[in-house]
A protein has these predicted regions:
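N-terminal segments that mediate ammonia production and transfer
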Residues: 2-98
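Helix N-cap / beta->alpha transition motif
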Residues: 28, 43, 262-263, 418-421
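ATP-dependent adenylate-handling active sites, centered on carboxylate activation for C-N bond formation
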Residues: 3, 11-14, 18-21, 79-81, ...
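PAPS-dependent sulfotransferase catalytic core
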Residues: 357-437
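Short beta-alpha junction loops
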Residues: 30-31, 156-157, 367
Length: 452
C-alpha cells in the first residue's frame, strides 16, 4: 500500500502517474516528463485552461493520465484499487459571529502567532518588501517582534512598488536591498526574482539566520483581500445566475483565450470547457453562501498553484519561502468571516488599523476598484496595474518579427498542434514578420499545444 498526502491547500505540488504495475510520483512535473515509460499524451483541456487561467483546473495537468494532488487529499494505491479522499474540507468552516472590531483583533493575533511559529529563534530574517499591503503586514509583525529584518525589493525603478517599499523601510529603520528590474523580464518575473535572490545569498548580501528561507507575502491579496471577486459577482451567484457570474468573473480577472487561433468547430467546445470547468469546481463546495464557493474556487485552484514554479525547482535554486498567509489556521479564521466583508480589501483595510502605527504612516499600493489608501501617493510613480510603458518603434518591430519567426517555426514543425491549424500559424507568421499587428499572445498559445 502506498499513500500520498498533500498539505491542506495543496500549495506544494505532488504529481503522480500509475498503471497496473507501478506508481510514479514526484514534486516536479519535469521528473515524470523525463521518464520514457510515462506516456506524454497531451490533454487539450489542460492546455487550453493553462492558456486561459494560467494553470489547469482541479487535478488536471497538460498530460492525460498525469495528475497533481488536490488540497488536503490522500491518494491511496493498493492491489485492491486506488482511492482519493479528503481529510479536510474548507467548505465546512463555519461562519463566525463576531463584530468587525473583534475580527480584526483576533486576525492579528492569529497572524502574529503564525509568524512567530515560523520565525522560531531567528534573530535576523530576510523578507521581501513591495509597495503593497501583504509584505508590509509581514515585515511589520517581524519588526515588532524584535527581529532584525533585512528587506529585499525587486521592482521597476520609479514604481510605487519600489518607492513606497523604500519609504516604509526607512520609516521603521530597517535595511532595504533593491534591484531595479524591467517591467516584464524576458524569462518571467519568478525566474528573474529567484536568480536575483540566489545571487544575493551567494554573495553574502542577505544577513539572516536562514537566508534560504525568505518571508514572502504570497497569498495575501486573494486570501485576505478577495482579489478577483467583487460585489456584482457575489450578487449574480446568490441570484442563481451562475453562467453570468462566471462570465463576469472572466472579465474582471482578465481570463481570455485567442479563439480565432482555432478551427471554427473547436471554438465553442473550448469556450464551453472553461465554463464547465469552473462550474464543476463550484459544485465541489457545499457552501451555504455561493459567494464563498467562488472564493474557494480561487483558493484551491489559482492560489494552490500560485507557487508551483517555485517549489518544482526547489532542488535547483534551494530557496524556501516562509508563507504566513497560507497558514492553515490563519486561512481557516479568514474563511469564517463573511465574504462580503472581505471583498475589495474592506476587511484588510480595517485589519491594518490594529498593526503598529508606523504600518499606516507610509502610503501603500492598492488594487484597482478596491479600498483606496487614505494617504496620498506621488503621481510620478508608475502603478503596477496601470498601462505598460510605450515601446520604442524599434523594440516593437523587433518583438513582432521575433514572434513571427516563432510562429513560422511552429507551422513548419511536424509536431502535433491539436486544434491549431497550420494555415492560421502561417498567416500569423506573415502578420508578425511584417509587424502589422501584435499577435504574439496567440503565437505563445499555439506553442503550448506543441507536442513531440
Amino acid at each position: 500500500v502506498l499513500q500520498l498526502f498533500s498539505d491542506k491547500l495543496g500549495v506544494r505540488p505532488i504529481y503522480y502517474w500509475c498503471d497496473e504495475e507501478m506508481v510514479v510520483f514526484a514534486t516536479a512535473l519535469r521528473v515524470l516528463e523525463a521518464l520514457p515509460f510515462v506516456p506524454k499524451v497531451r490533454d487539450d483541456a489542460g492546455v487550453a485552461e493553462t492558456i486561459a487561467f494560467g494553470y489547469p483546473l482541479a487535478e488536471r495537468t497538460q498530460y492525460l493520465g498525469v495528475s497533481v494532488m488536490r488540497e488536503a487529499e490522500i491518494v491511496r494505491f493498493s492491489s485492491l484499487g486506488n482511492t482519493r479522499t479528503c481529510y479536510w474540507r474548507w467548505d465546512q468552516v463555519p461562519t463566525q459571529e463576531m463584530t468587525d472590531s473583534d475580527a480584526v483583533k483576533e486576525a492579528y493575533e492569529v497572524f502574529t502567532d503564525t509568524i512567530n511559529i515560523r520565525r522560531r529563534d531567528d534573530k535576523e530574517v530576510g523578507a521581501f518588501l513591495s509597495g503593497g499591503m501583504d509584505s508590509r503586514a509581514i515585515v511589520a509583525v517581524l519588526n515588532e517582534s524584535g527581529a532584525s529584518v533585512q528587506t529585499i525589493n525587486f521592482s521597476p525603478d520609479r514604481s510605487q512598488d519600489q518607492a513606497l517599499a523604500r519609504a516604509y523601510a526607512e520609516r521603521i529603520g530597517i535595511p532595504f536591498l533593491s534591484a531595479p528590474r524591467k517591467r516584464n523580464p524576458k524569462d518571467g518575473f519568478r525566474v528573474a526574482l529567484t536568480r536575483f535572490v540566489r545571487n544575493c545569498i551567494d554573495r553574502g548580501e542577505i544577513k539572516a539566520d536562514r537566508p534560504n528561507g525568505l518571508w514572502s507575502g504570497d497569498g495575501g491579496s486573494v486570501g485576505v483581500g478577495n482579489v478577483h471577486l467583487d460585489d456584482k459577482l457575489l450578487e449574480l451567484l446568490r441570484n442563481g445566475d451562475r453562467r453570468s457570474a462566471i462570465k463576469h468573473f472572466f472579465r474582471i480577472s482578465q481570463i481570455g483565450f485567442p479563439y480565432r487561433l482555432l478551427k471554427p468547430e473547436d471554438r465553442k467546445l473550448v469556450a464551453e470547457t472553461f465554463y464547465t470547468g469552473v462550474e464543476n469546481e463550484l459544485d465541489r463546495h457545499e457552501c451555504a453562501d455561493p459567494g464563498q464557493s467562488m472564493f474557494l474556487f480561487l483558493m484551491v485552484n489559482d492560489q494552490r498553484k500560485h507557487l508551483y514554479d517555485v517549489y518544482e525547482d526547489l532542488d535547483l535554486h534551494r530557496l524556501e519561502y516562509q508563507l504566513p498567509f497560507f497558514d492553515s489556521r490563519f486561512l481557516e479564521f479568514i474563511c469564517g468571516l463573511p465574504v462580503d466583508y472581505r471583498n475589495n480589501h474592506r476587511f484588510y483595510t480595517d485589519w491594518f488599523s490594529v498593526f503598529p502605527e508606523t504600518t499606516r504612516m507610509v502610503p501603500w499600493q492598492t488594487y484597482p476598484e478596491h479600498v483606496e489608501c487614505p494617504l496620498s501617493i506621488p503621481e510620478d510613480l508608475s502603478y503596477q496595474w496601470g498601462p505598460p510603458p510605450a515601446q520604442t518603434f524599434t523594440a516593437k518591430v523587433s518583438s513582432r518579427i521575433s514572434s513571427g519567426f516563432e510562429a513560422l517555426g511552429l507551422a513548419l514543425n511536424p509536431a502535433d498542434l491539436g486544434p491549431v491549424p497550420r494555415s492560421r500559424l502561417l498567416a500569423l507568421a506573415g502578420i508578425q514578420l511584417l509587424a502589422i499587428k501584435d499577435y504574439s499572445y496567440a503565437v505563445k498559445a499555439a506553442a503550448r499545444y506543441r507536442s513531440g
